[in-house]
């Protein structure tokens, strides 16, 4: 979908119109172990995205956020190798997470790609700050295009400080300031990690971009243990934002690329000097939001919608229950 300067490509897989894996994305029958399925599928997916962007007068370099889903963590490194062929430098903010399965049989990769075709390319600026730990994947911590700021998904990891200070603990990539002592009952891992991500990582990048936490209009939150951690996440969200929370989506996934991480958060924000207005929307006639955030946030001409499920304060609504 293209709207004004924005381009949104969603659910791009290496499939045909019947949602069957394309022949060029399948390993050769006689040599099944000579090529990786994710490498083959990645070339089809990235070529498709590049083709769409070219048809719109742009390129992959117009990307401001890339969301990648794999069916195995083992596919991350082969995918990254292929990605460098298409974007050898200036890679946009990114998140990459494993999931149990994708909707097309045989698909091991799915990509969402957001781009901004700015009328004036000089308004695009790559955001980098040493106040937040650098990322290992080579992508930008953030990108600002005009009024808009897009940040990469951030976990509580700090790869420069990976050893655990706690006796008896497993190895962890979580930053010391985001850890709780496993030898004590005190503290919440999810709450410590969310607070660290938002204040020490995303907050620092936003400040470098001319923005702040209160200017966030959309947050994508990936949880590896949603049944255990959703309440703790909501506690921190409520404390951070009060009644000015961004539109928030909750995405259950299978893990992260940093040992010990339980959450990853990517955000979209407006700059402090943005001319666009912001409206938080809660609709009284439908079930209240599932967490401490509005149903949606309208920022400029874009509408960002929070997670919506068929539930109210008592659980699943009657009209959504099976008829047996």
What positions do the PLM features span?
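N-terminal presequence-like segments and the immediate start of the first folded domain
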Residues: 1-47, 51-199, 203-217, 224-324
């Amino acid at each position: 979908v293209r709207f004004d300067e924005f381009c949104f490509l969603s659910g791009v897989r290496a499939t045909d119109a019947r949602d069957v894996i394309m022949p060029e994305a399948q390993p050769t029958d006689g040599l099944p172990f000579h090529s990786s399925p994710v490498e083959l599928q990645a070339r089809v997916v990235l070529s498709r995205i590049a083709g769409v962007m070219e048809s719109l007068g742009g390129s992959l370099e117009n990307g401001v956020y890339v969301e990648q889903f794999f069916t195995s963590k083992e596919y991350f490194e082969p995918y990254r190798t292929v990605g460098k062929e298409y974007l050898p430098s200036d890679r946009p903010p990114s998140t990459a997470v494993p999931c149990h399965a994708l909707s097309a049989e045989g698909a091991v990769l799915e990509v969402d790609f957001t781009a901004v075709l700015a009328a004036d390319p000089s308004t695009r600026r790559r955001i980098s700050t040493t106040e937040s730990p650098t990322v290992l994947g080579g992508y930008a911590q953030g990108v600002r295009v005009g009024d808009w700021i897009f940040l990469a998904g951030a976990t509580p990891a700090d790869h420069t400080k990976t050893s655990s200070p706690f006796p008896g603990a497993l190895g962890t990539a979580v930053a010391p300031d985001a850890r709780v002592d496993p030898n004590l009952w005190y503290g919440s891992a999810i709450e410590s990690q969310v607070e660290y991500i938002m204040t020490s990582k995303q907050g620092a990048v936003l400040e470098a971009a001319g923005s702040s936490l209160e200017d966030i209009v959309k947050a994508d939150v990936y949880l590896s243990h949603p049944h255990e951690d959703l309440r703790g996440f909501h506690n921190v969200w409520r404390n951070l934002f009060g009644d000015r929370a961004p539109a928030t989506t909750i995405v259950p996934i299978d893990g992260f690329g940093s040992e010990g991480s339980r959450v990853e958060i990517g955000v979209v924000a407006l700059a402090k000097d943005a001319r666009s207005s912001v409206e938080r929307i809660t609709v009284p006639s439908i079930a209240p939001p599932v967490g401490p955030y509005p149903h949606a946030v309208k920022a400029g001409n874009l509408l960002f919608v929070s997670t919506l499920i068929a539930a109210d304060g008592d659980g699943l609504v009657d009209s959504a229950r099976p008829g047996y």
